[in-house]
Amino acid sequence: MSHSSAPERATGAVITDWRPEDPAFWQQRGQRIASRNLWISVPCLLLAFCVWMLFSAVAVNLPKVGFNFTTDQLFMLTALPSVSGALLRVPYSFMVPIFGGRRWTAFSTGILIIPCVWLGFAVQDTSTPYSVFIIISLLCGFAGANFASSMANISFFFPKQKQGGALGLNGGLGNMGVSVMQLVAPLVVSLSIFAVFGNQGVKQPDGTELYLANASWIWVPFLAIFTIAAWFGMNDLATSKASIKEQLPVLKRGHLWIMSLLYLATFGSFIGFSAGYAMLSKTQFPDVQIM
């Protein structure tokens, strides 16, 4: 097949001619397109990690705004996003070859607005039942699954010799969302930045106001911005299309299962400890202001 129409096809939302291993193609167009997709993917993934870790900052503060949940219940809220996120990573890993990286990144980023908005309203009403928080925490797990689809998507854009660096940037900078959440949340909950939406602060013993809804609402405008950026700025690669049936043979590879166990022990521990750190610190040092 002739590649004479490659320049036109490489500029649309769907790219039908993609040859990252071809040095000439890579230098002329491939590198620019791949870099653009990478640098839109990074903030989308970072925001996903922020949403994934929402309850690491929110659960520890629920008693301060009038909720009488037990310590075990609060720990459960911090753990459930990791559970649903881990389970959802399996189907999410198959989504990019089916729907395309642009479509899936925009969709999977946009739906994270739902738990963020819902949680913001839920924490302002002390009659909100625990079951609602359970549902919201499980929905936050969708954010954790984004890691699987995001990494799969970026790998298609780069030649093999550059995939390590690209995936390192995407995953490494994306993981910073854990730290960003735990840095930003304690700052924004002290500010009345969403009063126009009816966000009322709760008076604390030291005289300050706690605006817990801010911990989730602060991410909504950024999620909206980067959902739009993903839709209009990223690309779908026709060459990466594959049905679930075509992808299943990878499950027969022993190295996949060995790497999965190593990943569970390393990254799984990182996420688990990060999610529960604030609650654990509060139970061990109750007199210390954690968040």
Each predicted region: which residue ranges?
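Extracytoplasmic
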Residues: 36-69, 181, 273-278
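Cytosolic juxtamembrane N-terminal segment immediately preceding the first transmembrane helix
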Residues: 1-50
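C-terminal membrane-cytosol helix-exit motif in multi-pass small-molecule transporters
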Residues: 190-194, 220-240
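C-terminal ends and interior cores of transmembrane alpha-helices
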Residues: 110-126
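Glycine-rich segments within core transmembrane alpha-helices of 12-TM secondary carriers
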Residues: 144, 164-190
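Hydrophobic core of transmembrane alpha-helices in multi-pass small-molecule transporters
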Residues: 115, 129-145
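Central cavity-lining transmembrane alpha-helices of secondary-active solute carriers
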Residues: 76-94
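Extracytoplasmic gate region of multi-pass secondary transporters
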Residues: 52-60, 254-291
